[in-house]
Design a protein with these regions (language model features):
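N-terminal localization/anchoring segments of enzymes in phospholipid and broader phosphate metabolism
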Residues: 1-291
């Protein structure tokens, strides 16, 4: 066990001996993931062949840069998401610019819209997005939303997923909270992903809530960033989203959402951590870069 874990247990054991010892004995083992999480993890393993190159050398896009190639190899092996490319990239220095561009791209959707966010909160930002989603769903666009139950708790009604379903938006509340002693409740999705037609993808640190675009100021002026990529890299974001959506529809054929598009001239390593496994891919990669 790593040093951080040991130190975290040392404090309650030393200062609250009876209680700390009992907690340690009961919780020291990593909890088995709930059945639904385990099923999705297994599905993810089975889906790897859809988007990982089979030659075993996924870092060839970074010929001449051994370090970048080794990073790409590690990410592909750990996540099943290969290095890819895009033909357009845009950086958003604020939530306001991110919001404006996201709304523009959502209006262009013709096939499908996938959204996965930690926080949904009714207000100017989310209401503007939702208006588009409902209209697009009425036009026949496949609209799907995943939000985290803990992240959105006390921000949306308990039955919010059902409410969105009635409005034509397919919705899944990830890992609903249950008031029991269950460490699987810590398995949350903090990802912020928007995917349009399998070509355009957004990500970053911005949730669908007004404080992120400074319409409200519960924590002062909010500064966060986001990006948009257009091209084959969007398929990696489709894979990320669908790994979680499998919880809702395990028998659906997802391969139609993972088709490749035109090759771009900009290399892109699009990957994520997952609430479904015990790998800390992002942390490991940062440490690899630092050291």
């Amino acid at each position: 066990r790593n040093a951080e874990t040991k130190m975290a247990w040392l404090m309650p054991v030393l200062f609250l001996p009876p209680i700390g010892a009992l907690l340690y004995l009961n919780l020291r083992r990593r909890p088995r993931p709930r059945r639904r999480l385990k099923q999705l993890a297994e599905k993810f393993a089975g889906m790897e062949c859809l988007y990982v190159k089979k030659d075993g050398h996924v870092g060839t896009e970074y010929a001449g840069d051994g370090f970048a190639a080794s990073c790409a190899e590690y990410v592909a092996q750990a996540t099943g998401l290969p290095p890819t490319d895009c033909y357009e990239f845009e950086y958003f220095p604020s939530g306001e610019s991110y919001c404006e561009r996201l709304l523009e791209e959502l209006e262009k959707a013709e096939k499908y819209i996938f959204l996965e966010y930690f926080i949904l909160r009714p207000g100017k930002f989310w209401n503007s997005v939702l208006d588009i989603l409902k209209r697009k769903a009425g036009e026949g666009v496949d609209v799907r939303v995943i939000y985290d139950d803990i992240g959105s708790m006390l921000k949306v009604p308990d039955n919010y997923a059902a409410e969105l379903e009635k409005q034509g938006v397919k919705c899944m509340c990830f890992n609903p909270f249950r008031p029991v002693l269950d460490l699987a409740q810590n398995n949350r999705t903090h990802r912020k992903i928007a995917l349009i037609d399998g070509v355009t993808a957004f990500t970053g640190g911005i949730n669908l809530s007004d404080e992120y675009i400074n319409e409200t100021h519960p924590f002062g002026h909010w500064k966060d960033t986001g990006i948009m990529v257009r091209g084959r890299a969007a398929q990696n974001f489709a894979a990320m989203f669908l790994q979680l959506w499998f919880l809702r529809a395990p028998d659906e054929d997802y391969t139609r959402y993972l088709s490749t598009g035109p090759k771009g001239d900009c290399s892109c390593l699009a990957f994520c951590d997952s609430p479904l496994d015990r790998q800390n891919v992002c942390e490991d990669l940062y440490l690899k870069i630092i050291y």
